Amino acid sequence: MEMNKKTIFVTGATSGVGLKITELLVAQGHIVYATGRNEVALKTLQRLGANVIQADLTSLTAIDKVCAQLPALDVAIFSAGVGKFAIAPMLTDEDITQMVELNIRVPIYLAKRIATKMIAREQGQLIFIGSQAGKVATPKASVYAATKHAIVGFTNGLRMELAPYNIKVTAIHPGPIDTPFLDKVNDESGYRESLGRLLLTPEEVAQATVKTIERPVREVNLPRMMGWTSKLYALAPATIEFLAKPLFNKK
């Protein structure tokens, strides 16, 4: 059965998961508005059929300009994000600011503006690309995990706030993904290889995300085993930290 054509906005559309989501949506015939910083990637998406908007979303002025260019939306997918991996004392203030800006403030500012218009229409869906780091923090990712914990809290509260207006809120929480994002992790310890089947492809995450448009759900945990691990972590954090310490410390 073909998916009904929808008008969809995607952030972080020029790389990684956001790029694959955008390509998949365009291929399915949806009307897609894609934003990102990479001008070359945006031109490629434009040739595929996407409506592109180049912007640095860490600026409130830019956020307002982008929102002013958007039509009535059926779905908004917030995929833009950044990670800097080191123990917290070794991160620069700029590293921390960048993660807080792009991973927390940007999706919240955008969701506020887009949800306001969806409320008036009493329909819509907001999809946030979170992370398993929002469920289970690990060494060298404490600040990154904090930003993703914020998204877990925000989506859980927002879901209840928007339910009376027939607006769905979905959170996608993937584990490690085989993208340039992962290259920022020190790989001398063999972290990438140690992940084995836990390592996701951008295509897998994109397909799981797009699937929730037709069948909205509360959240998606990828891979499934990590979803179960996060549930066990909530019950016995010290035990999970002890058992998973060898893997955690490879990062």
What is each model feature region?
Residues T14-S15:
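Conserved glycine-rich cofactor-binding loop
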Residues A80-K84:
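Conserved NAD(P)H cofactor-binding loop of Rossmann-fold oxidoreductase domains
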Residues A111, T147:
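Active-site helix of classical SDR
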Residues S131:
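Residue(s) in the substrate-gating loop at a strand-loop-helix junction
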Residues P164-R224:
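SDR active-site lid
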Residues T116, M160-A163:
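Alpha-helical segment proximal to the catalytic Tyr-Lys
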